[in-house]
Amino acid sequence: MGTERFPVTGLFFSHGGFVKIGLTFDLRSEYLAMGYDRETTAEFDREDTIDAIETAIRDCGHQTVRIGHLRQLVSRLAEGQRWDLVFNICEGLHGIGREAQVPALLEGYQIPCVFADSLMMAVCLHKGLTKTLIDRAGLATAPFHVVATVADIDQVQLPFPLFAKPVAEGTGKGVSSASVIRSATELRTVCTDLLQRFRQPVLVETFLPGREFTVGILGTGEDATVLGTLEVKLLSNAEQDAYSYVNKERYAEM
């Protein structure tokens, strides 16, 4: 009989063999088969990623159930299926709060899931809102302006160079070497293009040159633990000055 803690606030399980853990995910191949393009599905996962997660959980002695994406989760819940815990890596497809949809649904059914809750997911996907909260908390973040319409472009009063990207995307979607902006003409061109393509506001911020790192953190406050640090180094044939969609999509070559 053991006690095991999962990365969910205050969640402990005492068990003699296993915990039934549901896996929620967006499988990229499924969406490509439905006709979605590669950029739209850029954040979604591959089969080998799901296999690796499932193997790791099973190696810890737990039972796994593959659920799938949001609509598949809705169907399973309607059928009366339940799990002790859900390991959620769903990105979602529709809406600016799409990453919060699976956690919110599970909260309604009182089924715990790993990682952030629905509120945190909704706040952090919107980079403008995230930066506003960080700034008001007194933490350093690059000066920024959120461009919601073409008319807002003239309101940007930040010195060049600037960096522009969709306010609520990931995996480099909407990011390219053109994202580094050095003139008012470039600012209008890039923002207009992003507003039309992604149908959401554009985050414009002071360009920060230099080295780029990704730091994995598990937990909150005093319980936070750094899992590892990764430095992004672009090769000579990569798009420069930006960890772009192309660089991420073709990472093995870049």
Label each region the model flagged.
Residues T3-V114, L119, V123-L125, L129, ...:
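ATP-binding N-terminal substructure of ATP-dependent carboxylate-amine bond-forming enzymes
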Residues F13, F18-L23, V74, E79-G80, ...:
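Active-site nucleotide/adenylate-binding loops and adjacent lid/helix of ATP-dependent enzymes
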Residues F25-R28, P166-A168, N247-E249:
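Short, small-residue-rich loop/turn micro-motifs
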Residues E30-M34, G170-G172, A238, A252-E253:
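Short acidic/His/Gly/Ser-rich catalytic and metal-binding motifs that mark active-site loops
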Residues I67, V147, I181, T229, ...:
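Hydrophobic residues at beta-strand termini and immediately following loops
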Residues V86, C113, F144, A164, ...:
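Generic preference for hydrophobic
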Residues A184-M254:
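Phosphate-binding site of ATP-dependent enzymes
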